[in-house]
UniProtKB/Swiss-Prot annotation:
The protein, known as: External core antigen
Function: May regulate immune response to the intracellular capsid in acting as a T-cell tolerogen, by having an immunoregulatory effect which prevents destruction of infected cells by cytotoxic T-cells. This immune regulation may predispose to chronicity during perinatal infections and prevent severe liver injury during adult infections.
Ranges where the record places region Disordered: 165-214
Region ranges (3 X 8 AA repeats of S-P-R-R-R-R-S-Q): 186-208
Taxonomic path: Viruses, Riboviria, Pararnavirae, Artverviricota, Revtraviricetes
Marked site: Cleavage: R185, S186
Coiled coil: none
Propeptide, chain numbering: 186-214
Length: 214
């Protein structure tokens, strides 16, 4: 795989520093953490099993359906949009290079080795990155980080002492919103106070009842 890595370094044309670090460093196995600037780590993502992440094609379709306009815009929308855009570009470069290497290798065993390596190792890293940034844009970064921590605690807890089902990302925003709402709830009450209820004298209430009877 050293030849494949060398070709990746030479052919990668991603324009930003982040994409260059992703293609030339992180995918190559160097000690670079592309999640650090977003408050997460590679180790935190590693708690999620490989079959947890959808396929690259499904993730690309999801990103296009939800954020196509922002991804195609030359303007900077958010760090997650930029990271997602450059990850997609890097995956395209990787596929182009893998196709070229596969077509120029005469040995079928070597071609299969390249394809399996890309799909198993680099493909998983791309799936993790795509899922992370799409989820942060959809649910919010804090919610995703809370989910990763919750899942990490759940998966490391012995089965006898943990709930049978793993945490679900889509349910966290509801509990998070409720918890924050409870913290910041004002002391105002919608129901009338006892003082207001006692402000009406019995005579006033009797006059109202007589008027209602008329």
């Amino acid at each position: 795989m050293q030849l494949f890595h060398l070709c990746l370094i030479i052919s990668c044309t991603c324009p930003t520093v982040q994409a260059s670090k992703l293609c030339l460093g992180w995918l190559w196995g160097m000690d670079i953490d592309p999640y650090k600037e977003f408050g997460a780590t590679v180790e935190l993502l590693s708690f999620l099993p490989s079959d947890f992440f959808p396929s690259v094609r499904d993730l690309l379709d999801t990103a296009s359906a939800l954020y196509r306009e922002a991804l195609e815009s030359p303007e900077h929308c958010s760090p997650h949009h930029t990271a997602l855009r450059e990850t997609i570009l890097c995956w395209g470069e990787l596929m182009t290079l893998a196709t070229w290497v596969g077509n120029n290798l005469e040995d079928p065993a070597s071609r299969d080795l390249v394809v399996n390596y890309v799909n198993t190792n680099m493909g998983l890293k791309i799936r993790q990155l795509l899922w992370f940034h799409i989820s942060c844009l959809t649910f919010g970064r804090e919610t995703v980080l809370e989910y990763l921590v919750s899942f990490g605690v759940w998966i490391r807890t012995p089965p006898a002492y943990r709930p049978p089902n793993a945490p679900i990302l889509s349910t966290l925003p509801e509990t998070t919103v409720v918890r924050r709402r409870d913290r910041g709830r004002s002391p105002r009450r919608r129901t009338p106070s006892p003082r207001r209820r006692r402000s009406q004298s019995p005579r006033r209430r009797r006059s109202q009842s007589r008027e209602s009877q008329c």
